[in-house]
Amino acid sequence: MTFRLYDTATREVRDFVPLEEGKAGLYVCGLTVQSEPHVGHVRSGVNFDVLQRWLRHLGYDVTFIRNVTDIDDKILVKSAEQGLAWYQLAYRMKRQLDRAYDDLNVAPPTYEPAATGHVPEMIVLIQELIAKGHAYAAEDGSGDVYFDVRSWPQYGELTRQGIDDMEAAEDADPRGKRDPRDFALWKGWKKDSEPETAAWPSPWGPGRPGWHIECSAMAGKYLGPAFDIHGGGVDLRFPHHENEQAQSRAAGRPFATYWMHNAWITTAGEKMSKSLGNSLTIPAVLQKYRGIELRYYLVAAHYRSHVEFSFEALDEAATGFRRIENFLDRAADVLGGIGGGIACADFLNAMNDDLGTPAAVAAIHEVVREGNKLLAAGDSPALRGNAASVVAMLDVLGLDPADPAWSSPGGGRTAERLETVVEGLVSDLLTQREKARADRDFVSADAIRDRLHAVGVQLEDTPDGPKWSLS
């Protein structure tokens, strides 16, 4: 089955046909590093990590670019409020974002360009737009440069809007604009309110790039004038992605062939956002759940579906993933290890259908159910292929518990030290239970069993003694 994906631009599911056979170029808008990342922030990182893993599974040579916006109006405001240099705040928040991605086993992109490292490329692109009559320098002395939206008749085609139906671009003082919808390509330095370090030299005077030009320039540098897939959160469709496409194509760069957008995480029906006070940071969630459980929760939902966050739903997801882990643990004990395998047809078909992760996860659970039957029947030869298939499918989703990436404190399986502690405590309780049973004190034996069950430890009495696993 051909890999098919939903293209936001055409609003239909299309066969993926790369510009160059065997290769795939992917650009995803990364975060503006202004505050500590929360669950809503990292969903995009996880979703597009699954995309790059799937493309590689299909045999594509993937070049994956995920940028970092490290200079921005909000960064300047928040750094001033905290008494920090803007670059200090950006660096600190970038470190926290890196840790969050590590905790969720988000593989690094091929390149992760920062906006501040690519100002020359942005200036060149702005000059091209001015030369082609699609941009102009403001005449109010501000040093601003704007994209002339009315010079590009296709403006609005990504989101299917007419120019006259759009709201004004609230990214700069409108006095220097020919049309309120014109958006800033370059922002002149405001020496009375902005630090000198937040300005770069340009033909229009000191200043800094606008948000939209950053991504166009960086995508062009690392992927060329035309590339396969551009991704990001659904909230970026307008104005950010609309503006990216318009300025790139106006400069003669075809830009993206496909557009993919992941949906929000919501709480009480509203987008998770720090400004709304309804966000949850990654460290806060990882105090109760493992990184692999949070990733499973995010992966199990389709990337285009809004996720209403709740701890109850996260509890259910964690329980579901533990069932998979427990099966693999038991299978590994019987087999002495699990080798490489092949994903089942239902999983492959689901992933080829616009990254259908809900159906893909369901396929994994079905194979696990079959595997548990094989364990009960003692059919080791069939179990070997079954368990290997489960591992292969989990690996595609970044959820293989044996992946070394999950050995970190926030990661997948409990850290080695904690495993030792749990093993010792459970073994001690089992010894007490066996003594109680030998003394025919079944009330005490059952009480120990119930205590273990209450904290998620399942017992199985076998001829070789009791066996335990996490439920």
From Swiss-Prot:
SUPFAM superfamilies, A to Z: Anticodon-binding domain of a subclass of class I aminoacyl-tRNA synthetases, Nucleotidylyl transferase
Motif ('KMSKS' region): 271-275
Chain sites annotated for binding ATP: K274
GO molecular function ontology, one term from the record: cysteine-tRNA ligase activity
Keyword 4Fe-4S: no
Residue sites binding Zn(2+) per the record: C29, C215, H240, E244
Cofactor note: Binds 1 zinc ion per subunit.
Compartment(s) of residence: Cytoplasm
Catalytic activity: tRNA(Cys) + L-cysteine + ATP = L-cysteinyl-tRNA(Cys) + AMP + diphosphate
Pfam families tied to this protein: CysS_C (PF23493), DALR_2 (PF09190), tRNA-synt_1e (PF01406)
Keywords, comma-separated and alphabetical: Aminoacyl-tRNA synthetase, ATP-binding, Cytoplasm, Ligase, Metal-binding, Nucleotide-binding, Protein biosynthesis, Zinc
Cofactor: Zn(2+)
Enzyme class: ligase
Primary site of residence: cytoplasm
Record InterPro entries: Cys-tRNA-ligase (IPR015803), Cys-tRNA-synt_Ia_DALR (IPR015273), Cys-tRNA/MSH_ligase (IPR024909), CysS_C (IPR056411), Rossmann-like_a/b/a_fold (IPR014729), tRNA-synt_1_cat_dom (IPR032678), tRNAsynth_Ia_anticodon-bd (IPR009080)
Assigned EC number: 6.1.1.16
One GO BP annotation of this record: cysteinyl-tRNA aminoacylation
SMART domains: DALR_2
GO cellular component: cytosol
Annotated motif 'HIGH' region, positions: 31-41
Assigned protein family: Belongs to the class-I aminoacyl-tRNA synthetase family.
Assembly mode: Monomer.
Name of the protein in question: Cysteine--tRNA ligase
Organism in which the protein naturally occurs: Nocardioides sp. (strain ATCC BAA-499 / JS614)
Originating gene: cysS
